[in-house]
Amino acid sequence: MPIDVRREIAQRALDLVGVPYKLGGRCPLAGLDCIGVVALALAGHIMPDEVPRDYTLRGEYLDRISAFFDRALFQNLGRESMESGDLLLCQTAPRQLHMAILTDCGVVHAHAGLRRVVLTPLPLPWPLVGRWRVLGE
């Protein structure tokens, strides 16, 4: 994928830092959850409404999320080096998954406990269970 596309995704994520947290949120004014952050950062590559909405905070949606991002528009990454703009799926608890976007400054994600979108430095405190990159145009 061209570097400028990866930078655009990372910058869109960084622009959301400070936005309020809201479970299921897709609007920065009302609030975003982790998947809402990913949907808005990918604007221009996917329609935000395409991203799955029927999940719960502690739901088992790994298969649904993986199937969505494994489609043709995304490259499923194995153990390759991580790059700014990569989409990360982490397991924050035994049955709790969480999405984030890698940037050169750290990882952007919606933090339910802090009630806002935050930038967290690496390394992440959670194991990665999935990683995708938007394919180039």
Please place each PLM-identified region on the residue numbering:
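...with weaker cross-activation on analogous glycine-rich loops/strands in unrelated enzymes
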Residues: 2-10, 50-121, 137
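Short helix-capping and hinge/turn segments at secondary-structure transitions, especially at repeat
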Residues: 18, 42-47
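A broad detector of the eukaryotic-type serine/threonine protein kinase catalytic domain
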Residues: 18-22, 112, 136
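Active-site nucleophilic cysteine motif
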Residues: 26-44
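Glycine- and charge-enriched low-complexity intrinsically disordered segments
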Residues: 122-137
